[in-house]
């Protein structure tokens, strides 16, 4: 990782500039999806052995990308359009993290049906499911950390869907804390504070960003204020300036 940005997009810039690149963004995302789907069916053997190392390496073999985008699943169309804009305007290929994390549950479902389901009781074994979940999450989080380490730039797509101020009282007292309820976003932002900065081999600056989705009623809050404070703030006018330099 060479640099990291905290990007807060505006509705105006999205509607007038980025949105028209959604079609290409969809194509990029779909290509990544096919790679992920292929990966899911390849490394679970008939004798019950899961090749975690090969699975992890294949899962992120498509991540030799210029940019990693971290985002909320609620912003997926905006992020796809943003990825299309980066490709069309700068020739940069961005990896959208939810392309992989969105299939985390598919992988777990496949494993659980094969190894955790009791056909007689027609139920899943609770302890085995905890075991498989911990393994899959560990494999994917490790792979993501390696991916982030090998990427020049990370862009956090910061919207109200990803970050919220903790409460009104803290705002009044000037003790703002930026909170996320997504464990994957928390993991990614935390990693940006721990990864060593690497000088790129070429002079151009690239961007990258990863994200995650939270779809359950259980909400766990993570304070990511420190991680965001260490990022470079990025706004629409910076994007326009970069585009004009092309």
Enumerate the predicted regions with their spans.
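Conserved beta-strand-loop-alpha-helix hinge of the TIR/SEFIR fold
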Residues: 116-137, 143-195
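Short beta-strand segments at enzyme active-site cores
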Residues: 97, 155-158, 205-209
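Conserved N-terminal substructure of TIR/SEFIR domains
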Residues: 2-151, 246
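Structural alpha-beta junctions
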Residues: 87-95, 186-202
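Acidic, low-complexity intrinsically disordered regions
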Residues: 55, 97, 180, 237-238
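C-terminal tail/extension regions appended to the core domain(s) of diverse proteins
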Residues: 1-23, 191-246
